[in-house]
Design a protein with these regions (language model features):
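Active-site glycine/GP-rich loop and adjacent strand/helix microenvironment
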Residues: 1-11, 139-411
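Nucleotide 5′-phosphate-binding alpha/beta core
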Residues: 1-127, 131-153, 173-175, 180-182, ...
Length: 411
C-alpha cells in the first residue's frame, strides 16, 4: 500500500508497543500527537530503550511548544544539535565557518538557554540553575547561548552589552574574528533594533554566517535581516522531535535533508493548496515516528501533493485562519502584510465578531503606517479573507510563554 513503511523500517520498530497493532493489521494510520502522549513512556518502552535511559544514551525532553502543549520526547543527547552541525558543515554557502572552527553563538528563546543551563546543572550535580555565567550557558565546545529574558522587546542596555561581551569572547577564538550566529529571526531583528537604540553599533561585529531556525520567518523580517547583514543568511526547517528536514541557500531555495526519513503530503482540511506534512522517520532510534503528523503545513509550486515540489513552509495547522473565502495560512496572510508595507515588524490578528477583526502591529521604525498604507492593508485583507479588519499600531506585542509570537490570537 502507498505510504506504508518498508520491511526494513518495520524491522527497526517491531518491538515498540505503540506500533504492535499496526504491524499486526499491516496498516499504519497517521500518527497524531495525542497518540504519542498516550501511556507515555510505556507505549514506547523496549529493553533497548530502557538500557539506553539507564546509561544516558537516551534522555527525556520536551518539545518547545510554540503555541500548543509541549510534547514529551525520548531521544539521544544532542539529537537536534547533531543534525544542525551536519547541515552547517556540509552547507555550500556557510560550511566554511564550520571548517574554520568558528564559535557559534545562539540568540533564541530563553527556554533554550534555560535548557542548556539545566543540562549543565545536572552534569555538575547542582540542584538549581542559573544563567548569569556564560559557562552555564555553554552547550559544548562550539556553542554558547546568549538570551536570558523571555521577551526580546524588553531587553535593556545591560542585556545588550552583556550579549555583545559574549559575542566578542566568541570572536577572540578565531584569528580573523569570525563567528557563526544562530538565531530565531525575531530575536535577531529585536537585537539589531536594540543595538541601534542604545548606540552600540560599533560594538556589534557582524557574523561570518547566520542560520535562523526555530520558527516561521515573515518576509519583512527576513528582508530586514538581509539589509543589515552581507553574510549568507540560511533558514533551517525542522522540529525538536524530528530534527531538521529542509534547509535553504542564500538565494532562498530549499533543499531536503531527509536522512532516514520519508515525507508525504495530505490536503489540510478543505484546502486544495495547503498540505499537512506526514513524516516517517527512524533518525531517532529510540522514538521512531511512522506516518507522524508534525503539525506543519506547506505549499507546492504547482499545487500538487508532491513533496519534491515544496516551495514554502506556510505555518502550523493550529494557526490556520478559517475565513469566509477559505483557509488562509500564516504565509498567505504574510503576503498581504509585506505587500502593504515593508515597515511592519510584529503583527497579530485578533478575530472579533463574525468576519470582523483587528490587526495589532508594530513597525521597525516605531511609527504607525501612513493612512494610505493602512487603507491598502485593510483592502488586501478584506479581498483575501472577507474580513473587515482594522489595523491598530502598537509599540509592543506580547510574546508567548514559549518565547515565540503567535500571529493569530485566540478568541
Amino acid at each position: 500500500m502507498e505510504n506504508q513503511p518498508t520491511v526494513d523500517v518495520i524491522e527497526q520498530i517491531k518491538d515498540i508497543p505503540i506500533y504492535q497493532q499496526s504491524i499486526a493489521e499491516r496498516f499504519f494510520p497517521i500518527l497524531e500527537k495525542p497518540a504519542i502522549a498516550l501511556d507515555f513512556p510505556d507505549n514506547w518502552m523496549t529493553p533497548r530503550l530502557a538500557a539506553a535511559l539507564r546509561t544516558g544514551e537516551a534522555e527525556f525532553v520536551l518539545s518547545t511548544g510554540t503555541h500548543h502543549a509541549r510534547m514529551h520526547i525520548i531521544r539521544p543527547p544532542y539529537f537536534l544539535l547533531n543534525s544542525y552541525y551536519q547541515l552547517w558543515s556540509q552547507h555550500p554557502d556557510i560550511g566554511f565557518t564550520w571548517q574554520q572552527q568558528c564559535q557559534r553563538v545562539s540568540l533564541t528563546t530563553v527556554l533554550a538557554t534555560e535548557h542548556v543551563a539545566r543540562v549543565n546543572a545536572r552534569k555538575y550535580g547542582k540542584r538549581t540553575i542559573e544563567t548569569a555565567s556564560s559557562a552555564t550557558r555553554r552547550l559544548d565546545a562550539r556553542t554558547t547561548y546568549l538570551n536570558q529574558k523571555l521577551d526580546p522587546a524588553q531587553w535593556e542596555r545591560a542585556d545588550i552589552e552583556r550579549m555583545l561581551d559574549d559575542i566578542e569572547a566568541a570572536r577572540h577564538c578565531h584569528p580573523h574574528g569570525f563567528y557563526h550566529l544562530d538565531c530565531s529571526s525575531y530575536h535577531l531583528a529585536h537585537f539589531i533594533l536594540k543595538v541601534a537604540q542604545y548606540g552600540l553599533g560599533a560594538r556589534f561585529p557582524k557574523p561570518a554566517s547566520i542560520i535562523h531556525a526555530y520558527e516561521y520567518t515573515p518576509a519583512n523580517v527576513r528582508w530586514f535581516l538581509l539589509e543589515n547583514f552581507s553574510c549568507p543568511l540560511i533558514d533551517l526547517f525542522g522540529s525538536t522531535e524530528l530534527g531538521y528536514l529542509y534547509y535553504n541557500d542564500r538565494h532562498g531555495n530549499y533543499s531536503p535533508f531527509l536522512d532516514k526519513m520519508r515525507l508525504e503530503l495530505v490536503p489540510f482540511a478543505t484546502s486544495n493548496t495547503i498540505f499537512s506534512m506526514i513524516v516517517s522517520s527512524v533518525r531517532n532510534p529510540y522514538m521512531p515516528l511512522i506516518r507522524y503528523r508534525s503539525g506543519d503545513c506547506v505549499q507546492t509550486v504547482d499545487g500538487s501533493a508532491d513533496p519534491e515540489k515544496i516551495v514554502r513552509f506556510c505555518g502550523r495547522e493550529k494557526e490556520m485562519l478559517r475565513a469566509s473565502h477559505g483557509i488562509v495560512s500564516q504565509a498567505d496572510f504574510d503576503d498581504l502584510i509585506c505587500g502593504a508595507s515593508p515597515n511592519i515588524f510584529v503583527y497579530q490578528l485578533h478575530p472579533e465578531a463574525k468576519w470582523q477583526a483587528c490587526l495589532h502591529y508594530t513597525t521597525f521604525n516605531g511609527a504607525p503606517l501612513l493612512p494610505r498604507e493602512a487603507a491598502d492593508l485593510q483592502r488586501r485583507i478584506q479581498e483575501a479573507t472577507g474580513m473587515d479588519c482594522t489595523p491598530l499600531h502598537r509599540t509592543h506585542i506580547d510574546i508567548g510563554k514559549s518565547g515565540k509570537y503567535a500571529w493569530l490570537a485566540k478568541k
